[in-house]
């Protein structure tokens, strides 16, 4: 770069004159291994002509030097072209630098103007910010109120959901009201029917209880009379055995075979032939009765409550044949419907159906 613009000396000026007469060049190959010039040559004492190299060698050296000089010239030309292009690039770069300096100045001025405008805006915004402190407080209060309103809205939505569910349940209940009313009316009618049935059965039970009490009294009187007749029959039988009449053996055999006494009883016309009544046991002639009270019984079977001996022509709970039939008094029940079956007449009056305390 520093040598650019200078004129380089040509290779003709760079040649050195040949020392000594004749202008011959002393080649270093002829002077030892290191190429040093001998001191005799340095002192101006030149070798003889016989010591000079041959002309072919000199010509080859000249050709080599000429090629080197041409190469250097070509390189110099290339360097000159490169130097010119670099000078052009330098001029363009300097022009660009000048333009950049101008742009930087304009940008600095614009930046200063912008900064001044921004400073003015910041000052205005600071004044407005100071004025907007009250607005900020109001905004905070409004946000708090909005949050509270959102919470209240959520609560109201949950309440509305609950009320909607309750309304749906109420609607379903309201839809069931006609069925419930009809069921209530049916239950009311059934209650009235059951009440009428209960009153009717109660009246029937009271009448039946009174008839049973009267039959019990009659039975007690009959039992006493049967006891008397039994005693008389036993006395007659004993007297016949003692007498040993002609028909005593046949009578006793008939009694033993059938288990019944021959002859007609006192109540045979009304109740049929009486069954065999065992002899009363001493100390066991009384038995409790839950309806009538304590009464005298002539035989052991009636000492237990609810015990009634089977007889061919008389049923104690039902009474004598044709005397009393409670079913004839109940053709129909309440409202014209068939009356439900009552307690069995074969059940003792002191049993489950005949006990007033269990009703």
From Swiss-Prot:
InterPro entries: FLX/FLX-like (IPR040353). Disruption phenotype: No suppression of FRI activity. Residues 1-27, 303-359 are annotated as: Disordered. GO terms for cellular component: nuclear body. Residues 1-16 have a biased composition (Basic residues). One of its GO terms (biological process) is cell differentiation. Keywords: Coiled coil, Developmental protein, Differentiation, Flowering. Residues 83-236 form a coiled coil. PANTHER family: PROTEIN FLX-LIKE 2. Has no transcriptional activation activity. Interacts with FRI. Belongs to the FLX family. This is Protein FLX-like 2. It comes from Arabidopsis thaliana.
